[in-house]
UniProtKB/Swiss-Prot annotation:
This is tRNA dimethylallyltransferase. Keywords: ATP-binding, Magnesium, Nucleotide-binding, Transferase, tRNA processing. InterPro entries: Dimethylallyltransferase, IPT, P-loop_NTPase. One of its GO terms (molecular function) is ATP binding.
Length: 325
């Protein structure tokens, strides 16, 4: 039990891009302190999606209690707002048990929702989404990315030309409001800057960032190959055989799954599956690092350093000691 849960950080947030060693570091912390782990990963919420998400094994999950893993069916959706609500409730419950909440993951929108709140943007509009999907089917997502660049160059500049989910949302918001998504978000941030800073203060945020991105890219390739060898295609084929899932769902849009689905549909060959899967993972990694670097309250640890786990532990120890004084 933590000596004084009231004096400890509200939660420790261990953030990092794909393949940065978050799980290994979290489990080492669990060996030293009485933590409960809250997953902050938009793919780990899905049941039956284990290999392509690098879900912690049953043995790993037995080391410490894990939360927000395997909580919904791939047919369903899970939002950043839902995560914030669930995580806040879990943090309070874990602290009440005298334990230390440890939030681990790389879904940075979830982190923003938890620590800063979300902007009050309009919800999804099925008619507009259907219209955008029809345009994409006819012209391709790169063409829609070009359309987005004309009306919202700031958002378009940070999106890959085939990032269907985010291009769709940005165009949807523009067509709903007549304003660029970037302007809507900037207005919200400006209006709530003080509250956001104040809300983020109780968290100890540690970011695992690579000193050499090429080394992380090599790790990503090795990891994707290991997923293929470990049965990713069989896992995705099982999802396809259900008959109620499609590549338009957020679950099947997850990196690795949409490429494997396309291969099983006969749309691409094995070489393209591997190439596209690795490229998509690297794009995800790039977005995650960009988000991390815009997080001023973080403590950076080089995830490629041989002693990176020890560095993380020292930051936690220092925080616990300073809070108890």
């Amino acid at each position: 039990m933590i000596a004084s849960a009231a004096s400890a950080p509200r939660a420790i947030c261990l953030l990092g891009p794909t393949a940065s060693g978050k799980t290994a570091a979290a489990l080492k912390l669990a060996e030293r302190w009485p933590v409960e782990i809250i997953s902050m990963d938009s793919a780990l919420v899905y049941r039956g999606m284990d290999i392509g998400t690098a879900k912690p094994s049953a043995e790993e999950q037995a080391i410490a209690p894990h939360h927000l893993i395997d909580i919904i069916d791939p047919l369903d959706a899970y939002s950043a707002a839902q995560f914030a609500n669930d995580a806040n409730a879990l943090i309070d419950a874990i602290r009440a048990r005298g334990k230390l909440p440890l939030i681990v993951g790389g879904t940075m929108l979830y982190y923003k929702a938890l620590t800063q709140g979300l902007s009050d943007l309009p919800g999804a509009d099925p008619a507009i989404r259907a219209e955008i999907d029809a345009e994409a089917a006819r012209d391709g997502w790169p063409a829609l990315h070009a359309k987005l660049a004309l009306v919202d160059p700031v958002t378009a500049a940070r999106l890959h030309t085939t990032d269907a989910q985010r291009i769709q949302r940005a165009l949807e918001l523009y067509r709903l409001t007549g304003q660029p998504m970037s302007a809507l978000l900037a207005r919200e941030v400006g209006a709530n800057a003080f509250q956001q800073h104040d809300a983020a203060a109780p968290y100890l945020t540690i970011a695992l960032e690579p000193s050499d991105r090429l080394v992380l890219h090599a790790r990503i390739a090795q990891r994707f190959d290991a997923m293929l060898a470990g049965g990713l295609l069989d896992e995705v084929e099982g999802l396809r055989r259900r008959g109620d899932l499609s590549p338009t769902l957020p679950s099947i849009r997850c990196v690795g799954y949409r490429q494997a689905w396309a291969y099983l549909e006969g749309e691409i060959d094995m070489a393209a599956l591997r190439e596209q899967g690795i490229a998509a993972t690297r794009q995800l990694c790039k977005r995650q690092i960009t988000w991390l670097r815009s997080t001023p309250e973080r403590h950076v640890v080089d995830c490629l350093a041989p002693d990176y786990v020890d560095q993380v532990a020292r930051l936690v120890q220092t925080s616990l000691e300073s809070q108890s004084q």
